[in-house]
Amino acid sequence: MIKFEKVNYTYQPNSPFASRALFDIDLEVKKGSYTALIGHTGSGKSTLLQHLNGLLQPTQGTVRVGDIVVTSTSKQKEIKPVRKKVGVVFQFPESQLFEETVLKDVAFGPQNFGISKEEAEKIAAEKLEMVGLSKEFWEKSPFELSGGQMRRVAIAGILAMEPEVLVLDEPTAGLDPKARIEMMKLFESIHQTGQTVVLVTHLMDDVADYADYVYLLEKGHIISCGTPSDVFQEVDFLKAHELGVPKATHFADQLQKTGVYTFEKLPITRAELVNLLTSLSVKSGGEN
């Protein structure tokens, strides 16, 4: 689906202000997967994200998106199809809303790619239903809606482009806890339809709950990758890099350090932790 091969990126190359942001990045996003990218500010997440849909081109190396290969010498007309294949929901996407009505805003993208107004509005209606905004909202101004509803409109606008890959950049930033949970459940339901998802986040619990593969970035390098279940076993390594672990993993690790119980494999989700502690309780009860 998407493959990075030895990707390097330097801002303002061949100048006194040259600053290298990515170093020999090898990365793969498989079709139908839910891939997470984790890293602090300055880790290279944003730079990497902009390579996913051709906003940036590698200084060295290649980015393959389907059958399109992007290099340092690719022309804009060659890259444009990538932006239809990969839809990016940037942080606070509601700030990009501008049309008179919700329906018109969501239909704008497809029309911009040459689809008729009638067909674009049909697609927009379908995507608005998908994100949980019923017909009563469609003729309202997007600016009359709540923050969470506005974000859903913006997400529907990206989905209306029918991208093969949906990239989410800190998608729950600024939302209250209830809205955050609802938003993550929405993305999971979209993923369940077969949509390939890339989640850029610093929230380890979201990675544990939803992602099937994760890449950890630090200062432009991938320092670890694998399934969340495997990556989050390296508690000391992650703490050394100030990345932390899911709450369930932290609790289990602390419990293990007391000597009360040794886990064969640390749980990464609350459900896994509850199941393990329940089985421990049952086992202890049976031994008494």
From Swiss-Prot:
Its EC number is 7.-.-.-. It is an enzyme of class 7 (translocase). It is found in: Cell membrane. Keywords: ATP-binding, Cell membrane, Membrane, Nucleotide-binding, Translocase, Transport. It is a peripheral membrane protein. One of its GO terms (molecular function) is ATP hydrolysis activity. GO terms for cellular component: ATP-binding cassette (ABC) transporter complex. ATP binds at G39, H40, T41, G42, S43, G44, K45, S46. The keyword Lipoprotein does not apply. It comes from the Bacteria. Residues 2-244 form the ABC transporter domain. PANTHER family: ENERGY-COUPLING FACTOR TRANSPORTER ATP-BINDING PROTEIN ECFA2 (PTHR43553:SF27), HEAVY METAL TRANSPORTER (PTHR43553). Forms a stable energy-coupling factor (ECF) transporter complex composed of 2 membrane-embedded substrate-binding proteins (S component), 2 ATP-binding proteins (A component) and 2 transmembrane proteins (T component). Belongs to the ABC transporter superfamily. Energy-coupling factor EcfA family. ATP-binding (A) component of a common energy-coupling factor (ECF) ABC-transporter complex. Unlike classic ABC transporters this ECF transporter provides the energy necessary to transport a number of different substrates. This is Energy-coupling factor transporter ATP-binding protein EcfA2. It comes from Lactococcus lactis subsp. lactis (strain IL1403).
